[in-house]
A protein has these predicted regions:
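Class I SAM-dependent methyltransferase SAM-binding "motif I" and its flanking Rossmann-like core
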Residues: 10, 85-148, 328, 394-415
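Conserved class I S-adenosyl-L-methionine
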Residues: 268-277
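Core SAM-dependent methyltransferase catalytic element
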Residues: 214-220, 339, 409-430
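A contiguous loop/helix-start segment that scaffolds small-molecule binding in enzyme catalytic cores
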Residues: 2-5, 16-18, 59, 150-248
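Class I S-adenosyl-L-methionine
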Residues: 1-106, 115, 291-294, 298-300, ...
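Conserved SAM-binding loop of SAM-dependent methyltransferases across substrates and taxa
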Residues: 278-290
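C-terminal substrate-binding/active-site "lid" region of AdoMet-derived donor-dependent transferases
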Residues: 356-421
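Conserved SAM-binding loop
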Residues: 307-308
Length: 430
């Protein structure tokens, strides 16, 4: 029987039915001062509950354990935790689900601020993308900025409307509109819509209540190429490499797309990118696969600087982790991968192959690109070893050669510049 009840409340919510009953017979009620003030009028004097201000999450479990009594079947032993709106929608509910057995928990949702915002604006919830920047890097917004998207955003002090406007301006979406919905359901509720320019021009004069959500209608000038991609195949020139014009240590677009198609990234993958350079493969992997975890390993100081700059530029700060060090020495402390890409080996390809191949599980993938002849020979030798039927770690092997010629129109007509062919090996552990 549940003895921890997580009840969603809003300023305008009516506590009725089972939620009201358990609250009126609870041993303790935990919530913010604002939430406790909302429920106090509903409590019965003959069943006084202990009222506790919600502590930090690191202290909450011990508080609940201290308040609990042995008999969870006694309704008087119930502990109430107050939550904002729907506890299981970007709320405290997930924390409870990971820290307590499900049979101890019961949830009572109220309308969430996201739902309320949609109703105020007459927008269907299924037509918006909900994003929480609360406690997250503002740069993660960049992975969601696409033309004609409507983003409903839960924010904190680092992602206020002015900060959202700056991100729109910096990424070429300066025609976007931002609607700020403050203090929803409170007497001093306020809804205002701003252009990006208005928010930036009047930045110091404009202030917003701490309780607010923002609707971002993403718009940019038509026909203008923007920094952030909307389809796989990020232009080489979009990366920061220190060389300009798409030059420098990045895997070029045509080869990069071949590598991504061979890696077949999916949710919950852990992928190592060894010799990540300026981040061509790692950044594109992370940008299109936000539930994939990528570790980009690089030892060269200047490339690391550009790799970090590209991580910020494309907003892949949550799922792309940069590791400074030499492989294979720096790999020991990383989470075990199920897929590995080697784009650079500093002449150490044989040792790398011998080190990383045993780490992969059955069905794991190793993808390696090769331009230099000695790298191609080492991969050929490795392929011969793992292709033998008697090999303990046999592999299914696929090899493609990507040859690219890029055309450019000059006064003499169309001229092609051939690029060095790249061999891409894929090994799947059988």
């Amino acid at each position: 029987m549940a003895n921890i009840h997580i009840i969603g409340v809003t300023q305008s919510s009516d506590l009725i039915g089972e939620a009201l009953h358990v609250m009126q017979h609870a041993r303790a009620i935990i919530g913010s001062e604002r939430q406790l003030d909302i429920v106090k009028p509903h409590l019965k004097a003959k069943h006084p509950a202990i009222l506790k201000t919600l502590p930090k999450l690191v202290e909450l479990k011990s508080l609940i354990d201290d308040l609990s009594i042995e008999s969870i079947n006694d309704q008087q032993s119930s502990i109430i935790v107050l939550a904002s709106g729907d506890p299981l929608y970007y709320g405290i509910g997930r924390w409870f689900s990971t820290h307590f057995e499900p049979e101890r928990l019961r949830f009572y949702p109220a309308i969430s601020s996201i739902q309320m915002a949609c109703h105020r604006l007459a927008i269907s919830l299924q037509d918006v993308t909900v994003l929480s920047l609360h406690g997250r890097s503002l740069k993660t917004l960049r992975t969601k900025l696409k033309s004609a998207e409507m983003l409903l955003i839960l924010t904190d002090k680092h992602s206020n409307p002015q900060a959202l406007a700056r991100e729109c301006q910096d990424t070429g979406f300066e025609e976007s509109l931002i609607t700020v919905l403050e203090n929803l359901s409170y007497p001093h509720e306020r809804i205002r819509t701003f252009s990006v320019a208005q928010l930036l021009d009047d930045s110091e004069q404009l202030s917003f209540a701490s309780l607010h959500v923002s609707l971002l209608e993403v718009k940019g000038a038509k026909g203008v190429e923007r920094m952030l991609p909307e389809f796989p195949g990020i232009p080489d020139t979009a990366y920061i490499t220190g060389s300009g014009g798409g030059k420098g240590m990045i895997t070029k677009r045509e080869v990069r797309l071949s590598i991504l198609s061979l890696l077949q990234p999916s949710n919950e993958d852990v992928i190592w990118d060894i010799g990540a350079g300026c981040g061509g493969v790692a950044v594109e992997l992370a940008y299109w696969n936000d539930k994939t975890t990528i570790y980009a390993i690089e030892c060269h100081a200047e490339r690391l600087e550009h790799l970090s700059a590209n991580q910020q530029r494309f907003g892949v700060v949550q799922n792309l982790h940069i590791i400074k060090g030499h492989a294979p020495e720096c790999l020991a402390d990383l989470p075990e991968p199920n897929k590995i890409f080697i784009g650079g080996s500093s002449g150490n390809i044989t040792e790398l192959l011998d080190t990383v191949w045993p780490l992969l599980p059955k069905g794991g993938l190793l993808v390696v690109s090769a331009v230099l002849e000695n790298t191609k020979k080492a991969l050929n030798d490795f392929a011969q070893t793992v292709a033998t039927i008697n090999s303990k770690t046999r592999a299914e092997i696929e090899v493609v050669e990507v040859s690219v010629k890029r055309g450019q129109f000059t006064h003499t007509g169309l001229n092609y510049t051939p690029k060095l062919p790249v061999e891409v090996f894929k090994f799947k552990k059988a």
